[in-house]
C-alpha cells in the first residue's frame, strides 16, 4: 500500500475521514493481513495455523473420507443414502448427536402425550431402560410438533419430560429453542450449557447459547461460543462468522466508551508529537522570548519562553514539560502581545491529547487575539476536518489565505485536506504551491511524491524522490518514505537499503530524539521479504527502547508474535496498544485485536484437541 501523509495531523474520532498520520502506511502494512485473512482475526482459530480455506478443506476432506469408508453399497442402497443425506442437508446445522437420534421401539408408539404414563422423577425409575428411551424419543417428537405450532410452553413441558427419561443434548437444546422464542435468555444459557456438557462440540447449542449471551450483553462469552462454533463447523456457517465480526465490533465499541469516560488525557509518543510539530515550518522565536532575554520562570512570559525551549529539545520529556509550561503561562497571565501564541500552543497540546473542545476554544481565542496568526487558522481547520466539518475547515483555510496568501504552510495543510478526500490533483497543486513559496521544506516534496504515486504516476513519483535525495541528502525522512514506496513495489533489497540509510542519519542527526519509523519499516520489510521474525522483533524492540510510547512499534510487535503463534505474548502487546490509543477509533481497533487474541487463547484452552488438529494443518510462510 502506498505511503500516506508523512507529517500527521491530530487524529480525532469521527465517522468522516480523518487525517492520516505519518506512520499510517506502516500501520496499513502491519494490519494488511487482517483483510486478507479475515477468518484468522475474526474466528480466531489461531494465527499459528492456516485458518482460512485450509480450515474448510480439513473438515470437508474429513467428511468425504468418512463417507468413502466401509463396504461398497448397491445402486439402490446408494440412492436411498443419497436421499437421506439430501434431507439432512436441508436441516439447520446440527450435531452428530442430533443426527443419531434414538430409534423408537414399536411397543412404545403413541399418538399424543395423553397416551403416555405420567412422567416425573419418581415414576421414571419404574420404567425399563428401553421404555425410558422410547418415551423420551416420543416426547421429543411431540415437543417438536408443539414447537412447530408455536405452543412453546407445552413444548417446554414435553422436552422437560423427555429429559427426565433420558438426559440428551438434543432435548436440552430443543428446550433452549423454546426459551429462545420466549426471550427467556437465562434459561437458554442454562439449557444449552447442559447440552454442551453432554456434547461439547454441539454446534447448534453453541450458536443458541452465543445468541443468548449476545442478548444478555455478555459479548465476550458470545464471541467465544460463536468462535468455537465456526471452528468446529469448519467455517461453513457464514452467519456465525458474521456474528463473530459483529460481536468483536460491539464489544470493542462498548469497552472503548467505558475506558474513555475515565481515561486521563495523555500526550502520544514523542515520534507522533514530533511528526505533527514538524508539519509546520520552523520559525525563530518571537522577539522578547529568545534565550538571550532573561525572564523569571515565575511570570507568564518566563513560562512561555521555557515551554518553547522544551519543544526545541524534541524529546518526550521536553514535550511533556513544554505542554505544562504553556498551561502555566496562561494561568500566570500578563503575556502582552504573546498571549495569542500561548493560546495557540496550549490548544495544540490539548489537541494532541484528544481534548478537542478545549483545543478548539484555545485556537479560536488565539485567532480573536491575533487574526494575522495564520497557524491558528490552519490548526483549527485540521481539527474541523477531523471532527467531520470539512466546510468549516475550508472556511478556515480561506480566512488564513486572506490574512497571508504567501504563507506556504496554508497550502501544505490544505493539500492534506484534498489528499484525505481523494482529490489528488488538487492536493498536488497545493503541495507544488507550497514548494514554490518555500522550496526548503522537505515534507512538501515528500508529500508531492506520495501524491503522484497515489495518482498512478509512478515515474514522476520516483523522480521526485530522487531529486529529494539529491537536494536533501542528509534528511532521513526522504530515505524512509522513498523506502516505503519501494517496499510497496516489493523491491525489498532497495527498500531495506533506504531504511538503513534513514536509520543511520537519524542516529547521526538526532541522537537524542531519533524517529523510530525507519526501524519499524525495516522490520516489516524483512518480515515480508524473508519472514525473518527474529530480526524483525529485534528491530521493534530497539524502537520501543527509544520510544516506549510508539503505538506503531507496539502494534507491529503484536502482529509479529501473533503470526508466530505466540498468542499470550501477542495479547500483552495488543493490550498495550489499547493503553496507548489516542482516539476512540484507535481504541476500538486495539480492543478488537486484543479481544480476538484473548478469545483464541480461550478456545485453545477449552478445545485443546481441536487446536491440536488445526495446528497439524499449519502451513504458509512463518506459520508454525
Swiss-Prot record:
Classification via SMART domains: TPR (SM00028)
Record-annotated membrane-spanning stretches: 39-60
Compositional bias ranges of the Basic residues kind: 73-83
Cytoplasmic membrane side: 61-624
Region (Disordered): 67-125
Acidic residues bias locations: 112-122
Alphabetically ordered keywords of this record: Membrane, Mitochondrion, Mitochondrion outer membrane, Receptor, Repeat, TPR repeat, Transmembrane, Transmembrane helix
Mitochondrial intermembrane topological domain residue ranges: 1-38
Keyword RNA-binding: no
PANTHER family linked: MITOCHONDRIAL IMPORT RECEPTOR SUBUNIT TOM70
Protein name stated in the entry: Mitochondrial import receptor subunit tom70
Organism listed in the record: Neurospora crassa (strain ATCC 24698 / 74-OR23-1A / CBS 708.71 / DSM 1257 / FGSC 987)
Gene: tom70
Amino acid at each position: 500500500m502506498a505511503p500516506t501523509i508523512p507529517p500527521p495531523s491530530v487524529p480525532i474520532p469521527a465517522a468522516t475521514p480523518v487525517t492520516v498520520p505519518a506512520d499510517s502506511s506502516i500501520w496499513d502494512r502491519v494490519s494488511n493481513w487482517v483483510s486478507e485473512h479475515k477468518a484468522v482475526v475474526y474466528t480466531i482459530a489461531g494465527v499459528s495455523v492456516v485458518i482460512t480455506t485450509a480450515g474448510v478443506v480439513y473438515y470437508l476432506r474429513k467428511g468425504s473420507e468418512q463417507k468413502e469408508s466401509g463396504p461398497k453399497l448397491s445402486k439402490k442402497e446408494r440412492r436411498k443414502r443419497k436421499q437421506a443425506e439430501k434431507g439432512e442437508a436441508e436441516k439447520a446445522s446440527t450435531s452428530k448427536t442430533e443426527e443419531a437420534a434414538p430409534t423408537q421401539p414399536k411397543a412404545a408408539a403413541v399418538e399424543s402425550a395423553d397416551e403416555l404414563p405420567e412422567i416425573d422423577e419418581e415414576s421414571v425409575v419404574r420404567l425399563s431402560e428401553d421404555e425410558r428411551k422410547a418415551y423420551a424419543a416420543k416426547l421429543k417428537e411431540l415437543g417438536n410438533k408443539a414447537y412447530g405450532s408455536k405452543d412453546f410452553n407445552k413444548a417446554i413441558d414435553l422436552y422437560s419430560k423427555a429429559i427426565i427419561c433420558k438426559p440428551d443434548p438434543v432435548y436440552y437444546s430443543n428446550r433452549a429453542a423454546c426459551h429462545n422464542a420466549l426471550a427467556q435468555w437465562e434459561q437458554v444459557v442454562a439449557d444449552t450449557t447442559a447440552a454442551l456438557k453432554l456434547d461439547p462440540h454441539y454446534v447448534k447449542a453453541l450458536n443458541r447459547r452465543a445468541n443468548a449471551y449476545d442478548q444478555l450483553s455478555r459479548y465476550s462469552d458470545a464471541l467465544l461460543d460463536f468462535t468455537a462454533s465456526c471452528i468446529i463447523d469448519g467455517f461453513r456457517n457464514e452467519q456465525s462468522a458474521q456474528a463473530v465480526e459483529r460481536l468483536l465490533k460491539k464489544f470493542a465499541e462498548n469497552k472503548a466508551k467505558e475506558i474513555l469516560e475515565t481515561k486521563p488525557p495523555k500526550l502520544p509518543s514523542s515520534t507522533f508529537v514530533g511528526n505533527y510539530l514538524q508539519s509546520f515550518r520552523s520559525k525563530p522565536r518571537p522577539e522578547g522570548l529568545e534565550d538571550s532575554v532573561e525572564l523569571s520562570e515565575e511570570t507568564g512570559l518566563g513560562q512561555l519562553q521555557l515551554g518553547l525551549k522544551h519543544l526545541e529539545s524534541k524529546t518526550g520529556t521536553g514535550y511533556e514539560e513544554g505542554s505544562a509550561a504553556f498551561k502555566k503561562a496562561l494561568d500566570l497571565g500578563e503575556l502582552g502581545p504573546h498571549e495569542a501564541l500561548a493560546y495557540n500552543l496550549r490548544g495544540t497540546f490539548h489537541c494532541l491529547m484528544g481534548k478537542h473542545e478545549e483545543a478548539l476554544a484555545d485556537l479560536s481565542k488565539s485567532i480573536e487575539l491575533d487574526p494575522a496568526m495564520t497557524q491558528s487558522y490552519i490548526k483549527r481547520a485540521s481539527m474541523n476536518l477531523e471532527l467531520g466539518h470539512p466546510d468549516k475547515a475550508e472556511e478556515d483555510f480561506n480566512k488564513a489565505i486572506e490574512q497571508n496568501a504567501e504563507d506556504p504552510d496554508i497550502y501544505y495543510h490544505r493539500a492534506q485536506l484534498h489528499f484525505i478526500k481523494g482529490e489528488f490533483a488538487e492536493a498536488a497543486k497545493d503541495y507544488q504551491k507550497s514548494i514554490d513559496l518555500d522550496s526548503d521544506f522537505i515534507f512538501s516534496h515528500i508529500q508531492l511524491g506520495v501524491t503522484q504515486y497515489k495518482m498512478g504516476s509512478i515515474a514522476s513519483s520516483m523522480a521526485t524522490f530522487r531529486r529529494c535525495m539529491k537536494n536533501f541528502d542528509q534528511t532521513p525522512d526522504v530515505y524512509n518514505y522513498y523506502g516505503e514506496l519501494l517496499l510497496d513495489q516489493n523491491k525489498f533489497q532497495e527498500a531495506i537499503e533506504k531504511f538503513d540509510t534513514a536509520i543511520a542519519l537519524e542516529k547521526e542527526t538526532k541522537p537524542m530524539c531519533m524517529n523510530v519509523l525507519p526501524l519499524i519499516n525495516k522490520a516489516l520489510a524483512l518480515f515480508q521479504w524473508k519472514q525473518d521474525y527474529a530480526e524483525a522483533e529485534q528491530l521493534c524492540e530497539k524502537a520501543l527502547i527509544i520510544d516506549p510510547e510508539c503505538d506503531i512499534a507496539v502494534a507491529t510487535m503484536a502482529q509479529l508474535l501473533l503470526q508466530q503463534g505466540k498468542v499470550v505474548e501477542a495479547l500483552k502487546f495488543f493490550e498495550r496498544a489499547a493503553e496507548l490509543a489516542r482516539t476512540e477509533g484507535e481504541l476500538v481497533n486495539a480492543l478488537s485485536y486484543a479481544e480476538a487474541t484473548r478469545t483464541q487463547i480461550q478456545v485453545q484452552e477449552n478445545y485443546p484437541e481441536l487446536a491440536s488438529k488445526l495446528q497439524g494443518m499449519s502451513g504458509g510462510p512463518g506459520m508454525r
